[in-house]
């Protein structure tokens, strides 16, 4: 039983790292979402992945409380401190649970 638990816990850390080697699921959608969430930024067409917040952070404008609920142990404490791959990985978890409508831009990009 202890061995099974150890394997399950290891999978929580290793799976996100393994998935980081290829483009995240819904990659192109998240790029569109990031561009929509950050209109008029100083980098036209680019996404400011390290956006500090304070309420909505990172390139996808993830609410801090939502980030805390869906990130896994070992990930940065704030979305703006996470890599773009980590942000997309968490965003996919959010979308799988509550849908893409968690982002206000969803209605504009779909």
Regions found by a protein language model. Give the residues of each.
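Peptidoglycan cell-wall recognition and remodeling modules
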Residues: 23-110
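N-terminal prepro-regions of secreted/extracellular proteins
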Residues: 1-24
């Amino acid at each position: 039983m202890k061995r099974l638990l150890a394997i399950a816990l290891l999978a929580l850390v290793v799976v996100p790292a393994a998935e980081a080697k290829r483009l995240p699921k819904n990659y192109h959608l998240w790029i569109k979402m990031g561009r929509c969430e950050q209109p008029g930024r100083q980098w036209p067409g680019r996404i400011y992945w390290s956006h500090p917040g304070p309420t909505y952070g990172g390139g996808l404008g993830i609410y801090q409380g939502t980030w805390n609920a869906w990130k896994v142990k070992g990930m940065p404490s704030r979305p703006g401190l996470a890599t773009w791959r980590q942000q997309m990985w968490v965003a996919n978890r959010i979308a799988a649970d509550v849908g893409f409508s968690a982002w206000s831009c969803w209605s504009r990009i779909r």
